[in-house]
């Protein structure tokens, strides 16, 4: 398997390129400018950079007011501080009036060693239930680089989970809103992944296919709306069952979206959900946390074996640093 390209700070460059000549775009920061890779924009366009300080609730109100005036605010902070802390303001000042505010959440799920205070493991669930909200979960550098263009014209609020630091490039084609990436097709089992779990799962899928299992692999970046016909087609084709793997609680995220879709379409396949089960996570490296909480490549193989009742004799490294994992370097702002 060829080495995976690692891209340094993909959001920093793409946001400057996207916003430089769009005078309506304003950049809001909650005192985490370097940590969410908007320091370059601050230097290039200081007149459109607004520092709101460590006051996320107020920042959401500011963003809503700017949007009412016809401007296009992009709010930047850690994912947990976009969702959990100012949730009422997001709901009442942004989602309820259906304003064009883009909420950019960094350090999603287990991608920080900062522990429970900094790990957004419930953010997709919180944002999915808000009427009018679009939800996107980036899985590689290409997703990060293209999410701004892909969501620019959404007529309402958008929440994006953004990877930072050194991020793997898994895909060449840009993200398309509402469209999943079908990485492999198969009619035995289909694995649906999102966020950093897609890169983690790739070696497992390759090993299983080499053993003769017809396993499909679909990367999902748009969690709401969840209406891509390709997802429904892949679910229907998987005669032995479906597996979801996500950097989030199993409640309210990708697994729940699949369960709802399958129930509504009367698809009676078994669904195995892999993610955090009714637990908060503790601090650690990404590779360690994926292993500890059962989200690593070898756990994907285990899940497929339980689902099919077969043994494939695949041995994958335990707790190895995944090539597809973003670094935990500078994982917390100090």
Each language-model region and where it sits:
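Thiamine diphosphate
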Residues: 1-161, 166-167, 179, 312, ...
């Amino acid at each position: 398997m060829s080495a995976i390209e690692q891209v340094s700070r993909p959001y920093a460059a793409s946001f400057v390129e996207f916003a430089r000549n769009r005078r309506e775009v304003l950049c809001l920061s909650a005192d985490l400018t370097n940590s969410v890779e908007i320091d370059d924009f601050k230097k290039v366009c200081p007149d459109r950079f607004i520092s709101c300080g460590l006051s996320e609730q107020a920042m959401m109100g500011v963003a809503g007011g700017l949007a009412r005036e016809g401007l296009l605010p992009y709010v930047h902070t850690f994912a947990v501080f976009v969702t959990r802390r100012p949730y009422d303001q997001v709901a009442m000042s942004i989602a309820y009036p259906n304003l064009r505010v883009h909420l950019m959440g960094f350090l999603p799920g287990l991608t920080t060693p900062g522990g429970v205070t900094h790990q957004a493991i419930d953010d997709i669930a919180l944002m999915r239930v808000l009427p009018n909200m679009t939800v996107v979960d980036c899985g590689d550098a290409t997703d990060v680089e293209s999410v701004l263009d892909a969501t620019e014209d959404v007529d309402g609020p958008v929440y994006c989970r953004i990877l930072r630091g050194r991020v793997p490039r898994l895909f060449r084609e840009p993200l398309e809103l509402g469209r999943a990436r079908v990485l492999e097709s198969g009619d035995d089992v289909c694995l649906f992944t999102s966020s950093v779990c897609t890169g983690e799962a790739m070696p497992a899928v390759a090993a299983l296919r080499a053993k003769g299992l017809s396993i499909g692999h679909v990367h999902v970046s748009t969690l709401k709306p969840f209406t891509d016909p390709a997802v429904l087609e892949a679910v229907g084709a998987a005669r032995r069952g479906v597996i979801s793997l996500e950097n989030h609680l199993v409640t309210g995220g990708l697994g729940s979206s699949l369960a709802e879709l399958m129930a509504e379409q009367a698809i009676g396949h078994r669904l195995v959900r892999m993610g955090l089960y009714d637990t908060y996570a503790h601090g650690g490296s990404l590779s360690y946390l994926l292993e500890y909480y059962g989200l690593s490549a070898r756990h994907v193989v285990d899940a497929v074996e339980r689902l099919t009742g077969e043994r494939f004799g695949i041995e994958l490294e335990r707790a190895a640093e995944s090539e597809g994992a973003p670094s935990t370097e500078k994982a917390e702002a100090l």
